[in-house]
């Protein structure tokens, strides 16, 4: 039985700290441990976030070390180099693979048997690295994938259509990055096909709107990084959502980074696809309808990632 009363965050940069703050507000855990190469940074973030506890649920947030992962239910890894202006997520790979080669064995040595959630970028590649190095069951090691990208898509569509984002069902799949694919053909608003709902709201130029929205969503991280040098609040909420689904065993459908086994003609590469997620990690992948163009783009996206992983010394 996994101890979902305790979570460990490895990495206390912008994303890690914002995620712990979001998790504190959610009140999901009794304990959250912060681990960072800079112990004082972890201590400072733990102190700062802890001062918000009186406004929420009682819990314990503190700096620790890898011995703390032994009895944790979830370990979240955000540690890694930051994406710089003009740098793609894939440009980060060599820096962050090296960091993971030092982190994952430390976790494995402690006999951790919970859920390992990868958030550091490039998340699809690093999820595969973590799967290979951790020795954990495949369904217990997955990445945050395109959960944030899909939320950005739903937000953009909600603004475009003046409708609640919670009523919009649409996924971005493939790479969490430049080759990501919007699954337009399966998108709907409370069961109404997206194109029909757009027409109902007075929007008829579907192709132009789809291209514009997809480009804006894909480039949103770059736009934010140019303005404030990092993105962290949106992904923190994505981490919170994934943890809620795991802890509560919601069996919700989320587009997370998983290893493919021939689905859509894609083999032995981690990409983001909709999956049922619960307390035992990934329960199953959920097939979605793709048109020929979307399928071709998905396969190209997976080819980019597979070539990169195959080039790594693991």
Provide a role label for each language-model segment.
Residues 2-7:
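Extreme N-terminal starter segment of soluble prokaryotic enzymes
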Residues 16-17:
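N-terminal Rossmann-fold NAD(P) dinucleotide-binding loop
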Residues 12-13:
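Glycine-rich Rossmann-fold phosphate-binding loop(s) that bind the pyrophosphate
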Residues 54-115:
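Rossmann-like NAD(P)-binding element
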Residues 134-140, 149-314:
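C-terminal substrate-binding/catalytic lobe of Rossmann-fold NAD(P)-dependent dehydrogenases
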Residues 88-154:
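Rossmann-like NAD(P)(H) cofactor-binding subdomain of soluble oxidoreductases
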Residues 31, 35-73, 87, 306-314:
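Conserved N-terminal Rossmann-fold NAD(P) cofactor-binding segment
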Residues 25-31, 135-137:
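Conserved S-adenosyl-L-methionine
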């Amino acid at each position: 039985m996994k101890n979902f009363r305790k979570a460990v965050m490895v990495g206390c940069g912008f994303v890690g700290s914002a995620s712990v703050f979001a998790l504190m507000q959610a009140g999901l855990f009794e304990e959250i441990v912060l681990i960072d190469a800079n112990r004082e940074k972890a201590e400072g973030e733990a102190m700062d976030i802890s001062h918000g506890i009186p406004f929420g649920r009682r819990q314990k947030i503190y700096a620790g070390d890898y011995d703390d992962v032994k009895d944790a239910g979830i370990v979240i890894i955000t540690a890694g180099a930051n994406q710089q202006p003009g740098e793609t997520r894939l440009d980060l790979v060599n820096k962050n693979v090296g960091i993971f080669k030092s982190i994952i064995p430390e976790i494995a040595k402690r006999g951790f048997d919970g859920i390992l959630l990868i958030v550091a970028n490039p998340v699809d590649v690093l999820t595969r690295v973590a799967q290979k190095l951790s020795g954990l069951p495949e369904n217990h090691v997955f990445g945050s994938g395109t959960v944030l990208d899909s939320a950005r898509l739903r937000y953009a569509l909600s603004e475009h259509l003046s409708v609640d984002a919670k009523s919009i069902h649409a996924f971005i799949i493939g790479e969490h990055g430049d080759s990501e694919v919007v699954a337009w053909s399966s998108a709907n608003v409370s069961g109404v096909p997206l194109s029909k709902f757009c027409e109902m709201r007075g929007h008829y130029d579907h192709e132009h709107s789809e291209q514009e929205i997809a480009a804006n969503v894909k480039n949103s991280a770059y736009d934010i990084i140019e303005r404030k040098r990092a993105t962290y609040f949106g992904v923190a909420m994505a981490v919170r959502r994934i943890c809620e689904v795991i802890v509560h065993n919601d069996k919700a459908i989320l587009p997370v980074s998983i290893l493919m086994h021939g689905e859509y003609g894609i083999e032995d590469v981690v990409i983001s696809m909709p999956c049922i997620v619960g307390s035992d990690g990934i329960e199953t992948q959920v097939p979605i309808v793709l048109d020929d163009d979307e399928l071709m783009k998905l396969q190209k996206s997976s080819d980019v990632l597979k070539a990169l992983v195959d080039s790594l010394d693991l």
